Amino acid sequence: MASFLRILGIETSCDETAAAIVERQDDGTAIVRSDVVLSQLDEHSAYGGVVPEIAARAHVEALDTLIDEALKRANVSLADVDAIAATSGPGLIGGLLVGLMTGKAISKATGKPLYAINHLEGHALTARLTDGLAFPYLMLLVSGGHTQLILVRGVGQYERWGTTIDDALGEAFDKTAKLLGLPYPGGPAVEAAAKKGNPDRFDLPRPLVGETRLDFSFSGLKTAVRLAATTIAPVSEQDIADICASFQKAVSRTLKDRIGRGLQRFKSEFPKTAEKPALVVAGGVAANLELRRTLQELCDLNGFRFIAPPLSLCTDNAVMIAWAGLERMATGAAPDGLDVQPRSRWPLDQKAETLLGHGKRGAKA
């Protein structure tokens, strides 16, 4: 009998098409046999953001080829995989349909079970793949579509402690870049400009700092950036750098307050964890070095491990989707039927209060 489970992962929730082959050993460790990702950056850059119809068509054109490439790199065939895991939400509905329907077709043709995976669960469980992290732990998800602080108790057991009430952090970066005439994607552009700027020139707001609830807000910060740029227009290259540096400083101070309160709550609820408590960061914004420095310092101050998976596993990828499927299989969870439907909105915490917050992919929960 095989001492491992092998799964094909498929990810098409936004503007990356991805496929991967991942194995889970009996001892819970993972082996990534292949990881193939095709970015649609060139297709969307002219529009300053992701265009859903263009994204869906690009997934249709690329996915079959990427799955073949993932199998080839892993030196396996579909007959050698034990199951298929495909993202079924949240995200852009057109892209989700492409990936999930492909997963269904493979499941039907091969008789292999299908697992419809929540994209956010993929992010939530990635640290167990990379670092063998034990439950429970905290995760900060920061991307173009999400800003959430989540308690991860176990596979399928998630509590949302905080979320954005308006813009997601990645969206705030992108909109700030657009306001200042910087290229898409905005996150890297703002970070690069900030390195040449004075973070103390503009006193930008730090939304919700001091409040006991753990939610986030970035819409007002984005508005303050616009007002600052308008006041000194026309802006020079140095002005742009100073605004970006001031923006990043405001974001860092905001996160320091919000996450710091979350770490204290975790310690009060779990005073005797077997291992050193951990904060995991995931999502494309996790690539920002200033953000990482802030979170590392915060964790050091509070006695937490800070875990930031490799960038390739922070942004959208199929490895995390495959791994989430393997984690579910290991718990004995039943596969999904072929009648499972994609969901543009699918909160991890089904009991959490619905808020008005939304990012690029629509309201989140």
From Swiss-Prot:
Organism: Rhizobium rhizogenes (strain K84 / ATCC BAA-868)
Annotated Gene Ontology cellular component terms: cytoplasm
Cofactor(s) annotated in UniProt: Fe(2+)
Keywords: Acyltransferase, Cytoplasm, Iron, Metal-binding, Transferase, tRNA processing
A molecular function GO annotation: N(6)-L-threonylcarbamoyladenine synthase activity
SUPFAM superfamilies reported for this sequence: Actin-like ATPase domain
EC number: 2.3.1.234
Record carries keyword tRNA processing: yes
Name assigned to this protein: tRNA N6-adenosine threonylcarbamoyltransferase
InterPro entries: ATPase_NBD, Gcp-like_dom, KAE1/TsaD, TsaD
Binding annotation for Fe cation: H119, H123, D316
